[in-house]
């Protein structure tokens, strides 16, 4: 689900997240144009991405805290490992993961664990996405706080 758009990027809340909302939630930033690596972005685009990443992480943390989920920190990752062997290659995207202090699956203070979906599809099967209220809060937070240009 698209939450927010800037000139060069799109922020989404995945319907099939890597992390259950109660473990901290999951957002993803995609580029509007096909880009494989950060180095392919202009300086202006890199600054826009950094600002969007920061504000989106803050919004995720606040939205989940309002839902009673204690977020200790936010992790940011751009890996692209699952698509390196696809003909089109990897596409730059940034994962934003909340880290809940009381997490049941992705334990707080430990490294995140993401098996390849082909190897372990059941791992992701029952993970709950952000709810409507959390998404609404994140949208409003970004509208109010994302000031770039």
Language model: regions and residue ranges:
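HIT superfamily nucleotide-processing domains
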Residues: 1-149
